């Protein structure tokens, strides 16, 4: 029962963590773009 609730918690938290990672990546990208010689050049 306890492990089942942990599984549900992970299932609920997974999209939140993914969105947080995507947000942080986009923020890092936005911070990197102005300082780079060619913005959006290296992916």
From Swiss-Prot:
A motif (CLE) lies at residues 31-43. Keywords: Differentiation, Host cytoplasm, Secreted, Signal. It comes from the Eukaryota. It is found in: Secreted; Host cytoplasm; Host extracellular space. Transmembrane segments: none annotated. Highly expressed exclusively within the subventral esophageal gland cell during syncytium formation in host plants (at protein level). Residues 1-30 form the signal peptide. One of its GO terms (cellular component) is extracellular region. One of its GO terms (biological process) is cell differentiation. Interacts with the SAW domain of host scarecrow-like transcription factors such as Arabidopsis thaliana SCL6 and SCL21. Plays a role in the differentiation or division of feeding cells (syncytia) induced in plant roots during infection. Promotes host root growth. Belongs to the CLV3/ESR signal peptide family. This is CLAVATA3/ESR (CLE)-related protein 16D10. The lineage of its organism: Eukaryota, Metazoa, Ecdysozoa, Nematoda, Chromadorea. The gene is 16D10.
